[in-house]
Design a protein with these regions (language model features):
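Alpha/beta-hydrolase superfamily serine-hydrolase fold, recognizing
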Residues: 1-176
């Protein structure tokens, strides 16, 4: 659905504001959808991936280190993964880290220190960089999964959110 919606919007971009730049972005599972969309829809301007889930089968230290007690836990992640697409456990769309990276749009990837998804997000940023894709990766110390929605209750979360948005704004400014 994300790919189809993006292709439709891209085909009618002038109706939505008149520029020819279209970026995708999302957090957590939305980061997964955005990464898959960037791999599937050519000529996107940018991708903004916020603590994305990009490798459902990987084994990462952050999944052990942050498995419990930091808002998103691995028990909940297992439930999400088992219910997201149980008939397609090896589908590349579940793990875009195992997909292609050549020719992808530049990216801003945000991760959080105390997030089970931290290391896969960092690995995705590294894979983009290794493929020659321009990428800014920010790992926010002291932050947990979901910090982008915590700006009203945490000064540190607000600062991290504002920094991430500023990085995206800088990236988009270079494309105009």
């Amino acid at each position: 659905d994300a790919v189809a919606a993006t292709e439709d919007i891209k085909s009618r971009l002038s109706q939505f504001g008149g520029t020819d730049l279209l970026a995708v972005g999302g957090d957590s599972a939305g980061g997964n959808l955005s990464a898959v969309t960037a791999q599937s829809v050519p000529d996107l301007a940018a991708q903004f991936l916020i603590y994305p889930t990009v490798d459902v089968h990987g084994d990462y230290p952050s999944r052990t280190d942050n498995a419990k007690g930091y808002f998103l836990d691995m028990e909940t992640m297992a439930w999400f993964i088992n219910h997201y697409a149980p008939a397609l456990p090896e589908d590349e769309a579940l793990s875009p880290l195992r997909g292609r990276f050549e020719g992808l749009p530049p990216a801003v990837v945000l991760t959080a220190e105390f997030d089970p998804l931290r290391d896969e997000g960092a690995s995705y940023a590294a894979a983009l960089r290794d493929a020659g894709v321009s990428v800014v990766h920010r790992d926010y110390a002291g932050m947990i999964h979901g910090f982008m929605d915590m700006d009203m209750i945490s000064v540190a979360a607000k600062a991290a959110r504002d920094d991430g948005i500023a990085e995206l704004s800088k990236l988009l400014a270079t494309l105009r």
